[in-house]
From Swiss-Prot:
Protein name in the entry: Cytochrome c2 iso-1
Gene3D superfamilies assigned to the protein according to its UniProt record, in alphabetical order: Cytochrome c-like domain
Species per Swiss-Prot/TrEMBL record: Rhodospirillum centenum
Listed InterPro entries: Cyt_c-like_dom, Cyt_c-like_dom_sf, Cyt_c_1A/1B
Binding residues annotated for heme c, in chain numbering: 15, 18-19, 98
GO MF annotation terms: electron transfer activity; heme binding; metal ion binding
Pyrrolidone carboxylic acid carried by residues: 1
Post-translational modification comment from the UniProt entry: Binds 1 heme c group covalently per subunit.
Role this protein plays: Cytochrome c2 is found mainly in purple, non-sulfur, photosynthetic bacteria where it functions as the electron donor to the oxidized bacteriochlorophyll in the photophosphorylation pathway. However, it may also have a role in the respiratory chain and is found in some non-photosynthetic bacteria.
PROSITE patterns: CYTC (PS51007)
Similarity comment: family membership: Belongs to the cytochrome c family.
GO aspect biological process, one term: photosynthesis
Keyword field: Electron transport, Heme, Iron, Metal-binding, Photosynthesis, Pyrrolidone carboxylic acid, Transport
């Protein structure tokens, strides 16, 4: 089943402890997520990323729907694997600031559908 952006908006409330989305959104503990689907990792303007996030972006990580789905259950494990698989295992250390995990697959599909409504 595909994601439902209306349900995704409700799921996104869990994310709002650290993130904002929309035309007037500002960075908080986490970066603004307006336009995140399709964006390169680690490049939201004005946000100070962890070294691990920077390494993933430099290794070519883009936030496709598939990558977001794979990231949300365990952000650190996903980023470390991406950086290692890209041939830079020495950069696959440290951690992202994102400690929240979203293990439920349908909730992830719904929140990705919601994020897509704010992306080109």
């Amino acid at each position: 089943q595909d994601g439902d952006p209306v349900k995704g908006e409700a799921v996104f409330k869990k994310c709002m402890a650290c993130h904002r989305i929309g035309p007037d959104a500002k960075n908080l503990v986490g970066p603004v997520l307006t336009g995140v689907v399709g964006r390169q990792a680690g490049v939201a303007p004005g946000f100070s990323y962890s070294a691990l996030n920077h390494a993933a972006g430099e290794a070519g990580l883009h936030w496709t729907a598939e990558n977001i789905m794979a990231y949300l259950p365990d952000p650190n494990a996903f980023l470390r694997k991406f950086v290692t698989d890209a041939g830079n295992p020495e950069a696959a250390k440290g951690s992202t600031k994102m400690v929240f995990k979203l293990p439920n697959e349908q909730e992830r599909k719904d929140v990705v559908a919601y994020l897509k409504t704010f992306s080109n």
